[in-house]
């Protein structure tokens, strides 16, 4: 009897050891155009986001988290590669993102999070918006992902009825129609629906994400869940339409929160929650041009398309009950940091043949140590607009809002803001701190020299019309 008891204890011990030594899973929930002020835990008084708020309480709420660029394509390239988009040609002054007539995509020599995790036996999936090249040779399957399901670019593209849509889009209760937009829904490399029924897209993304978790629960996995919402045009399922009794935009956000809850349930149901890191964030700030359909940056200045805080500081939460130490992190971090952080937590190798701009935040997550990110360069449309070091941020170029006919403003003299004391960037203190301005400008010059070997512009090209 004692021998059997001993054997049972040994099996139990080694089983627990194997479980604790298993590489962690990673889930990134990446919203489209979600503003800093659009989440309950980040200050919105009306939007109900109980699942995201739960993540913020049980995990880490990051109040100073940045994206690599204030628009879609370059921001996504930065997250997946850990590199400023200027380095791999994924930002442009001519065309700001990829379009359905774009011949290019994320250069295949770039390495993504999926590609550095694959050698460790990770299953990988990209579900949702891709926007890094829609041609077969640039789809997620060519960038380390085992599975793809989603719309390959923005949900407002491939349309000849933009004018008709815009005439109605400012109505807060306007519910768009699929007929305006001919975007395809792709599974792996095959178009399975066109136009995609966007009223069910958040639900279908969620179903595919949960299926992936269920299918791969016995091995480590990386799930990149990139929602198409709340980028305009706004779509929501019948179940959520009108549920908030506030506006269509709020309905959309609350459906995304439901989606987050379904992902957390799947992890908990399969006993994966204590060995998984879930990141919730956004690709850039809100598209304020669309008013009630465009969200809110809360206390931050401006929104999408700008290098003010509202354009590149995004609501971010890290959750993982067995890995992430709970708390509020009022330090800098960025989506650029996800690649080196996931590499550190998993034991993956970071490429050494190229510059990685991200920092390893793993000790902040596990021990609430001090963040190693002390600076951030604000790029937009292939131009360096601003730079932050510690609490000080200097601007040399600006755009107030994304509007394709509006040029970048070259400032006559630099503007300086103390971001810790002046989160809304209202008070220019450049004249009071000329030495700080000089120091930051020197850093910008060094950075510009550092990116001189960048790949050529990948976004500017157009395919010939048939």
Question: Where would I find each of the regions flagged by the language model?
Answer:
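Formylglycine-dependent sulfatase
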Residues: 2, 16-415, 421-466
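Sec-dependent N-terminal signal peptides
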Residues: 4-14
């Amino acid at each position: 009897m004692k021998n059997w008891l001993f054997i049972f204890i040994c099996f139990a011990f080694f089983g627990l050891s194997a479980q604790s030594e298993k590489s962690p899973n990673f889930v990134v929930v990446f919203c489209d155009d979600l503003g800093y002020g659009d989440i309950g835990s980040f200050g919105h008084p009306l939007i109900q986001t109980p699942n995201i708020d739960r993540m913020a309480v049980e995990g880490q709420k990051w109040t100073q988290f940045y994206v690599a660029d204030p628009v879609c394509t370059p921001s996504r390239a930065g997250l997946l590669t850990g590199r400023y988009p200027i380095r791999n040609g994924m930002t442009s002054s001519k065309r700001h993102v990829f379009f359905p007539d774009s011949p290019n995509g994320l250069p295949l020599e770039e390495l993504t999070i999926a590609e550095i995790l694959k050698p460790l036996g990770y299953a990988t999936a990209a579900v949702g918006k891709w926007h890094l090249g829609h041609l077969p040779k640039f789809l997620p399957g060519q960038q380390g992902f085992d599975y793809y399901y989603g719309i390959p670019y923005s949900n407002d593209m491939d349309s000849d009825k933009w004018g008709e849509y815009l005439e109605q889009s400012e109505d807060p209760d306007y519910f768009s129609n699929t007929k305006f937009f001919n975007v395809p829904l792709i599974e792996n490399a095959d178009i399975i629906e066109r136009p995609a029924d966007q009223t069910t897209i958040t639900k279908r993304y969620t179903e595919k994400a949960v299926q992936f978790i269920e299918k791969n629960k016995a091995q480590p996995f990386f799930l990149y869940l990139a929602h198409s919402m709340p980028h305009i045009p706004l779509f929501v399922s019948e179940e959520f339409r009108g549920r908030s009794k506030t506006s269509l935009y709020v309905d959309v956000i609350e459906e995304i929160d439901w989606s987050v809850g379904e992902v957390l349930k799947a992890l908990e149901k399969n006993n994966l929650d204590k060995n998984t890191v879930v990141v919730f964030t956004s690709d850039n700030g809100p598209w304020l041009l669309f008013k009630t359909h465009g969200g809110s940056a809360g206390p931050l200045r401006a929104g999408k398309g700008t290098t003010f805080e509202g354009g590149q500081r995004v609501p971010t939460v890290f959750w993982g009950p067995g890995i992430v130490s709970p708390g509020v992190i009022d330090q800098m971090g960025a989506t650029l940091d996800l690649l080196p952080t996931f590499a550190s937590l998993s034991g993956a190798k970071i490429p050494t043949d190229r510059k990685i701009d991200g920092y390893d935040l793993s000790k902040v997550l596990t021990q609430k140590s001090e963040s190693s990110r002390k600076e951030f360069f604000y790029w937009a449309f292939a131009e360096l607009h601003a730079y932050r070091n510690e609490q000080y941020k200097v601007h040399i170029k600006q755009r107030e809002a994304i509007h394709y006919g509006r040029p970048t403003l070259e400032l006559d003299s630099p503007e300086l803001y103390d971001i810790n004391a002046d989160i809304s960037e209202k008070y220019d203190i450049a004249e009071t701190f000329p030495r700080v301005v000089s120091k930051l400008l020197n850093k910008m010059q060094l950075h510009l020299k550092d990116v001189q070997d960048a790949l050529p512009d990948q976004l500017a090209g157009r395919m010939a019309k048939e």
